[in-house]
Amino acid sequence: MKSSSKIRTVQKLSGFCQSPDVRALCFLFLLLSASCSFIFRDYLYGNDLMIFNDIGSDTWQQYIMNYTSIVNHLRDGSFSLWDFNNGLGINQFNFNLFDPFLMLLYGVGVVLGPAHMLLYINVIQILKIMVAAFAFYWFLSQFSFSVPSKMITSYAYALNGFLLVWGQHYQFGTVVIYFPLMLLFCEKFIQKKKGKALFPVMVFLCGIYSVYFTYMCLAATGLYLLFRILMLDGLTWKERIQRFLLGCAEMIMGVGMSLVVFLPMAEVLLNVSSRLESDGTGLLDFLRQCFTPYSRKFYLSMLKRMFSSNLQNGYGLAKGPQQYVMNYYEDPVLFCSTLAVFLNVQFLAVLRKADMTKRAKRVLYGVAALILVGTALPVGGTVFNYFTLPTQRYTFVLMTVFLLLMAWMRDYMRKGGKLNLVLILAVTALMGWAYWCGYEQAGFQEYRTNILILTVTGILTAVCLTLLCFLKDIQIRNVILGVMGVVLVVNVVSEGGTNYQNRVTMKKTDVPAEVMVQETQRYEEMRTSDDKEIKYRAEIEKPQDFFREMYRVDLADCLNYLKEKDPTFYRVEKDYISGTVSMDSSGQGYRGISTYNSVMNGNVKEFVETCYPELFFADHNHYTFWNNVDDNWLAAFLGVKYILSGNGEPDETKYKLLDQVGSLYIHENVLDAQTAHFYTQDISEESLKELCTEENREELLGEAIALEDGTEIGDASEIQTLKPEEQETAEQNSSVTLDAPQKDSVVTGSVHAEADGYALFMIPYEKGWSLTIDGEKAELLRGDIGFLACEVPEGDHTILLTFEAPGLKAGTIGSVLFWILFAQSRLLIIRKNKTRKSAGA
């Protein structure tokens, strides 16, 4: 019995290994491994890390610092859903905590350390490419495509422009995997195949990954569901509507199952940040915005980017001149091989004679019209960006459509289908124009080489397609299709590698300290060269001291010294730039105020815009203090008590020298720098907004607290008339002290109030915070536009501020209920199937 069981197991395994799909996937894995070895050669075998400081500077200046902060908190056991190491403080649901690939990266960081974690970012990008290929192959397997068509199309999908361009922003690339998987289970639902019951689970996995991209995926999947049901024959309209509504219910169930994460992330995106702000226009203005054509330059960029994402780079993606409408990322990303352009255009021509029902043809022409209108006009970018300002970040949806049609067209050609020669020539001419324009403005030789390779492979593709117009022999046609497959590999590998060349990247090792001066001098000479290629290549070769600065021992010693010396909740800043422009605190583990955040707290942003716009650096997503150190009053107001500096002689009217640790000096603010303040007088927010100037802001912020329903004043001087001398004295003798948090989501402190008044906490005003005074729950107010505040009665009190991510409790309850509903519905399906089988028997 045992031997026969083993024989059956071996036979099953042998049959599995001989499966055409398994062999195709093995070959696909090997082909992608070789391709990625070439594309990422400088990152795998050279000194580059997939961390950019050019147009992709979010990776260096923001993302890796966020990841480092998360890893550091996990390693020392202090992780919480609020983080004071990021600016004035941030809800951790701002980040994609449950992106599976980022979770893998965090795990590497916890085990090996945050610095070593950075070495594996490019490995994770390659892993995404592999998973994307397998996911798309699985999706294509729901149809009757041939194995070669599925394999070559999945290869093109794995190296599509969106994953290789937007994938440089790490979490953005993951959607390229989730979307075809959602379509896969949607298709199983439509065809009533085994596994259709897992459709909501796939939506759940997407829902805990990203609210922003889940919305786009759901919108696109809903359209896919609608059009696929319309294509089906043999259904009444009532049955179609029922099937569509049931599919929508499955998606809603999946979102409900993900509410434990989805809802807190949605709270941040929709209620705190200003990422999705609209201009508040009326319906007619909104429709005009949706259907007013883009500029001519946009359409030219769109045409070029169908053939390559690198035709407008000019002299690189750093400080060199470029030819984009917006930039390398935000212009439409449409490339998924030159062959895909030819075949998608051909599809529109051959569809009318294709072997499918008239209903299916009409639906597909409708889909084509919808895609054309959605991409050519702002309506597509508007709808996919939550009906706000249009963006082009939804184009990952188009990659799936383009390559699905490419797979169909390849099988159509394999079966002897006729092609339209005129369209082949037209696309060839358009391709020639795009590559000619790109070559003319390409600055670096690497860009020109890529364009030449794309041109040659494009011409070879056109020649192969032209031959297919005339040759009827199936064997010869298969040879030509094989040649086209090889040409496609060269095409996408050349283009893919170019996305990662001539980039300003972080290096795996710093320039040695002893040659830093010499290398910096060489960089300056290159930067001022008359030769444009040398001049713009300078940023690529700029000497690096990132790791030396980020992990310097004396800075860690300074922070430990302050931690032992001062038990209160204080903030630290630096008067110099080291690892990043504004995110060193996240990486180095101290509480500052500088930050870079694309989804900035809208209340704090309004405070900065109103009172201290000089905190903005370059745009409204960066706050920096190193260039505002001289304003020690602002430092004291925000709780910046200590400054780390390389200067041993501070301005003694503002800071005093506290100590020296290594080569760093610790300066202490001469003013009373606290993270909380006491006031006896209030003014209205509107008064603060109307009156605040550079000349009177210290008086307005220092003498009164601004509340939403505070006292209206016409001039800053009126505050003194509102406060009698006794009230002024009581205010001066009162204090609010916060203790250093052990976990940032829990802040304790005490209040000494010699009169009734208000406490202002220099913590961003955000849903999720709750307050107790002497154990009794108290109401939190919005103070000074951007911060937490409360009323405080006279006397001595203890306070407790606690942060619970808004939406987390409700989301947890919702998730539990929807999971129960999911389990019950699946059990019901199983029972129905058993009943049906027994009735059939």
Protein language model features and the residues they cover:
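Contiguous transmembrane helix-bundle modules in multi-pass membrane proteins
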Residues: 192-195, 213, 363-551, 794-841
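Extracytoplasmic/lumenal acceptor-recognition loop(s) of multi-pass membrane glycoenzymes
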Residues: 90, 94, 487-549, 560-634, ...
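Active-site lumenal/periplasmic loops and adjacent helix-entry segments of GT-C-fold
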Residues: 41-143, 148-180, 205, 290-330
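Hydrophobic, aromatic-rich transmembrane alpha-helices
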Residues: 323, 336-368, 461-471, 827
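Periplasmic/ER-lumenal interhelical loops and adjacent helix-loop junctions
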Residues: 57-74, 78-81, 91, 95-103, ...
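Membrane-interface helix-loop-helix junctions at transmembrane boundaries of multi-pass membrane enzymes
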Residues: 235-245, 346-372, 595, 610
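Active-site-proximal, structured, solvent-exposed surfaces of multi-pass membrane proteins
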Residues: 5-8, 66, 704-841
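Membrane-embedded helix bundles of polyisoprenyl
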Residues: 34, 126, 130-143, 148-232, ...
